[in-house]
Amino acid sequence: GPPADPAALIISGAPATTGINDGVNAIDDRVYFGAMLAAGAAEFIDGAGVHPYGWANPPDARAADPTQVSSSHNNHPSFFFADTLADYRALLVNAGADSVPLWPTEFGWGTFAGLLTDEGQPATPPAGSEFMADNDEWEQAVYTLRAFELGQEWDWVGPMFLWNLNFTRALGPEFQEVGYSLLRFDDSRRPAYRALEHRDE
């Protein structure tokens, strides 16, 4: 039947970046997104969801860059904000769907710098999230602002959703999600929050 709200926008779900395509543990997100487009998904969406996380890499960095900042998660395009967006854009163009904008529905940079445990000790990234030790709170702020600048420069990028505001209210330091939060455990504002608060539109 007809849609309940013809003005509602339909945004495709964003595949998680994997960098793995072994057919058992994961399907590479680029392969999956390409298959979505090959199946005709572009005909039914107003925007394509994408999760261009930068891990600990600056938003302008690329996997092909020989000088890496991050000590890990730096050997595949899926670890780079700009590479992920460029790869998804290329897939849209190749599918003849270049009019479909990319919507970064989740992105950000995590760091445990400035986060304290209940005992007042510096929190450290949990196992598997050691890359967050490569960024401090100021880099989190600078990278976030630059990512928004890039999104505005690229006319094929739609609305961008930064993740997350305050998982620190729900989770403890044993969870990697709190590293992305713009608020600390005591609700004080991290530099990224303040930078966005005072950013020119």
Regions found by a protein language model. Give the residues of each.
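Noncatalytic carbohydrate-binding groove/subsite architecture in carbohydrate-active enzymes
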Residues: 1-134
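Aromatic-rich peripheral "rim/lid" segments of glycoside hydrolase catalytic domains that contact
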Residues: 118-201
